[in-house]
Amino acid sequence: MNTCLRTLVAALGFTALAASAQTKWDMPTPYPAANFHTENITQFAADVDKATAGKLKITVHAGGSLYKANEIKRAVQGGQAQIGEILLGGYANENPLFGTDNVPFLATSYAEAKKLAAAQKPALDSLLAKQGLKMLFSVPWPPQGIFAAKPINAGADLKGVKWRAYSPQTSRI
C-alpha cells in the first residue's frame, strides 16, 4: 500500500537579509547532487549567473558537504553561508508555522500544496524576516508514502515495522 501522507512544500532557498553584494556565494544543500531538489538549485545558480552576467556566482555544495541539514539555517543566519536550502518542517520545534506543510493529509496533491504555500507565505515571510531571513522560493515535495518490504493491507500489518520520519508531525503517525 502506498498511502499518500501529503505533499510537502519542502525545499527553501534562504538568503540573509544583510548579505553584502558579494560576487561568490556558497549554497549548502542537504540533498545529493542527483536529487531533484539539488538539480533545481543547480539550475537556479546557473540562472542567477546568467541574469547577473556572471557578477554573482553561486557554488552549490550538495549532500551536506558544507553544512549538515540541521546546520544550514543557522549558517545562513550567522553569515557563514550566504544562501542555503532547508527542509522547513525540520524547524517546527522553533515555531509551529514551520511545520504547517508537514501536517499529514493536509495537502495531498501538488495543487493543494500550491494553495497551502500561498496561504502560509505572508505569515512565513513575516516570521523569517524577524529571524533575518528571506524565503526566495519553495518547491513541492512529491506525495509521501509508506514504503515497506511486505504488503500493508491492514493496521495489524504494521506491527513490528520500524519507521523513519523527517519531522515531528510525521513521527506522530
What kind of feature is each model-predicted range?
Residues 53-57, 72-86, 161-164:
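Alpha-to-beta junction loops
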Residues 45-46, 82, 87-173:
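Contiguous mixed-secondary-structure segments that line small-molecule binding/active-site clefts
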Residues 1-21:
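Gram-negative bacterial Sec-dependent N-terminal signal peptides
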